[in-house]
Each structure stands twice: as structure tokens, then as C-alpha cells.
């Protein structure tokens, strides 16, 4: 029988596991509020597009019936205030950088960013141009990089699955 939950570290985990086993037989589930919030956050990513060039076409294709991104619990949103994931796809210019930062700042916490394509990752083909930002990670913090020029819809889908896996594993990402 369990003695109490006032123990620390590994002893507390063992006590919690023992209590969970006892309650499972009676139809109860023991978990933490943080685990429930992370489970809900992982299964309901609301993303907004920041399509700047040809990668945006592949990003749109991911929402079509062949790939159907919504079956993974993600849904597109038009407003940054309703989304927690921003997908930056395409060439980011110096004139567009302040707009990207402004949209990012309007998103509620926790917020995630996927950089899609060579241009968003590091400037791509236009890397040496005077008007191109050499990677959107210079403007906003990026969680997942999707390589390619342009990356396929499968690559973006894999990037979103990796982000969900990362959220599930670590909870809220620490920056």
C-alpha cells in the first residue's frame, strides 16, 4: 500500500504510478494538468500561413484532400491572434521582415514557427541579394526547419509531425 505523496523525485513517480494502477481498475485516470494541456495543445495546432514565394504553393497543397493536414489536428487560421503556429514559406525580404515580426508578436503564447524552404531557412537562391534576409531565424525564433527548394508537401507534413512530437516530448518549448 502507498504511504503518501509527500516524497520527492523518483519515489514520487513510483508512488504516482502505484496510485494510477490502483485507480485504473476503478475507471479513473491520474494525470497532471500540464499533461492534459500539452495533450490538447499537441492535437490542436492552429496555423497561419506566411507565404512569400513559390513554397506557399506547396504549403497550400498540404491542406488539399490528398494530404489533408486537418486529420492531424491542425487547422488554418486567418488571424495571428487565433493561431499558435506560423509557417514561413518563401523569400523573406528586408521590407517584409518588420511585418513578419509584428505578426509573430501578435500570436499568443506558446507560439511555434516552421521555416519552410531554402529561402526561408537561409536566403536560398537569393542569398547574396542586398534585399534578402538570410534566414527568417534572424527575425523570429524558429522551431522546425523544412529543407527543399521548394520542399514537397510530404516534407512539410513531416515537419509538422516533428513539431507535434517535440511538443509531446518536452511540453511547452523553452526558448
Curated annotation (Swiss-Prot):
Its cofactor is [4Fe-4S] cluster. It is a peripheral membrane protein. Its main location: membrane. Pfam families: Oxidored_q6. Keywords: 4Fe-4S, Cell inner membrane, Cell membrane, Iron, Iron-sulfur, Membrane, Metal-binding, NAD, Quinone, Translocase, Transport, Ubiquinone. Coiled coil: none annotated. GO terms for molecular function: 4 iron, 4 sulfur cluster binding; iron ion binding; NADH dehydrogenase (ubiquinone) activity; NADH:ubiquinone reductase (non-electrogenic) activity; quinone binding. The keyword Iron applies. Binds 1 [4Fe-4S] cluster. One of its GO terms (biological process) is aerobic respiration. NDH-1 shuttles electrons from NADH, via FMN and iron-sulfur (Fe-S) centers, to quinones in the respiratory chain. The immediate electron acceptor for the enzyme in this species is believed to be ubiquinone. Couples the redox reaction to proton translocation (for every two electrons transferred, four hydrogen ions are translocated across the cytoplasmic membrane), and thus conserves the redox energy in a proton gradient. This is NADH-quinone oxidoreductase subunit B. It comes from Paracoccus denitrificans (strain Pd 1222).
